[in-house]
Amino acid sequence: MKNQTSVSFQTSCGLLQKLVDTAERKSRENLKQFGGRLVLIEGGGYEKIWLETQPMGGEMYAKRNLEAGINNQLLFMENQRADGRIPGSVACEDGKIIPQFNKFQGFCFPSAALNVYYLMGKDPGYLDLLYTTLERFDSYLWRVRDSDGDGCLETWCKYDTGEDHALRYGDAPDDWSKETPPEGCSVVPMASMDIMSFSYASRETLAKISRIRNDMEKMEFWKEKAAQVQGKIRTYLWDETAGACFDRDKNHRVLRTMTHNNLRAMYWNSFTQQMADRFVNDHLLNPEEFWTHMPLPSVAVNDPLFRNVTTNDWSGQAEALTYQRAIRALENYGYDSLIPELGEKLFQAIGEDCIFVQQYDPFTAAPSLVCLEGEQDCYGPALLSVLEYAARMYGVHLEQDTVFWGTVGGYE
């Protein structure tokens, strides 16, 4: 029997109802056919499925369209290369699916893909494919992305971590297809909390899959392997005095830019609780850094490398994608109480106009309406963020076998 999915939401608050209804309608515009397969693209001018957004986006949308949610996982798994590398994006041109390997483009995949296993009814074949995909990708990372042998995985281009135009990358290339690092750059290959977290999240999910299979020996194996990655992050990238992680350049020098990537690491669950507590209390909630009028700029607003650029730029403005990832990041470490604060900020920033864009001014909360080649709307991470924050605050959400009820007051 085919699984049936649907979501219903009603509230007496006119703004919230309008936001949810509009997000529902505009999300449907991002449903596309890729070679006869229904997928949810990123939208807002981004016509592909990217590894940094669309497995996570597909999992969030699976409650409304399970077929698209599943395909947003499978197209990455089915197009994994023989050497274990997963495509950073998948395009469709003239009906043909084209996996692209010129960047990692983030990795919001393992936890989302595992959750889809539960949403689809626990298909063992899907679980086997996910296990194999993650095991092979983790092996690829450690075989290729520790080019100097210091035990810390590296990012080689801006798009590896999805940080378009980020100043902290210096003269690094935007993308990179080769299996050896670029030469002659000032910063890369860069020891990276993001890429290390790719490995941690893969290994943690492999441990969870092993538990589902009742393979306790493998579960302990992967838990120990994940702990090794977490330990290296703590000893090599974490600064106990500063209470934050910092990447290192090709000469192992600490790059002191205070970045939101610490929150990304929390999304991948690669911080210890103590590390997360320090970053949240010392930096995330600091109004001089990340807890601005519109919270979550990509770089702390008092950092020398912050730029309040209104077009796609990860050196500054608050990104809808960061809001989307922040939900899991905060839930992982018990900071659920911050989710309604962020949700309310996002609802008010989008407002009655219901234009869903990529970036927001951290000082005024004004949406940056122009991106790529013109005015932007229907940006998937903004649409799905509205739907997910509403579910967390006033509805229900599903995490593996558990149903959570939102009980925030104010919009009954």
Where are each of the predicted segments found?
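Catalytic cores of carbohydrate-active enzymes
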Residues: N3-Q33, Y46-K48, W142-K158, F198-R278, ...
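Aromatic-rich carbohydrate-recognition surfaces in CAZymes
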Residues: K48-Q73, E78-A166, M196, G316-Y333, ...
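Active-site acid/base region of carbohydrate-active enzymes
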Residues: Q4-S6, Q10-T22, K63-R64, R81-D83, ...
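C-terminal capping/lid segments that line or modulate ligand- or cofactor-binding pockets
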Residues: T11, I49, P99-Q105, F109-L119, ...
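Short, mixed-charge aromatic SLiMs
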Residues: E78-S89, R136-Y140, G231-T235, L285-L296, ...
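The feature captures the catalytic groove of carbohydrate-active enzymes
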Residues: G88-C108, S139-E224, V254-R256, N261, ...
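Glycine-rich, acidic and aromatic/proline-enriched surface loops and short helix-turn segments
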Residues: D21-K32, L66, L75-A82, F109, ...
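Active-site flanking loop/helix segments enriched in acidic
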Residues: L38-G43
